[in-house]
């Protein structure tokens, strides 16, 4: 394995999705495909930070300063926030978002539309920004 150096370090973000359950806490993990890096391992959702993840308008309820403070980084925390939301949606269909500052309530037609948007995103036919703009949802 090559030693870490400034030029080979990639920004990445991972999230632990945890919820209360009558039998105890539940932790959400995904199984990686049998090919590529870390085949067949169970991991937390996440991945590399894309250039498009640095878009403050995707998070109107959170500033970079606030995100950075919550994540314990000096600056640029908002790009990790956006990256983790995008990766969760891409990898497992979990949409970490809000609408007008509250929980997102989707009817069946909206769920189907967002599901189709996810397929378009995975096929490279739609950007993450477009998914959010079409659904009127914010991270």
Predicted regions mapped to residue ranges:
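Short, N-terminal intrinsically disordered low-complexity segments that are rich in Pro/Gly
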Residues: 4-5, 74
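Conserved N-terminal beta-strand and adjoining loop/helix that marks the start
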Residues: 5-27, 36-51, 55
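Residue-level signal for short segments within beta-strands and strand-turn junctions
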Residues: 17-19, 31, 98
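Hydrophobic alpha-helical segments and their boundary regions
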Residues: 29, 35-36, 77, 125
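A residue-level detector for conformationally permissive "hinge/kink" positions
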Residues: 32, 38-39, 85, 128
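The catalytic Nudix box helix
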Residues: 44-46, 52-134
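Conserved small/polar residues in nucleotide/adenosyl-binding loops
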Residues: 137-139
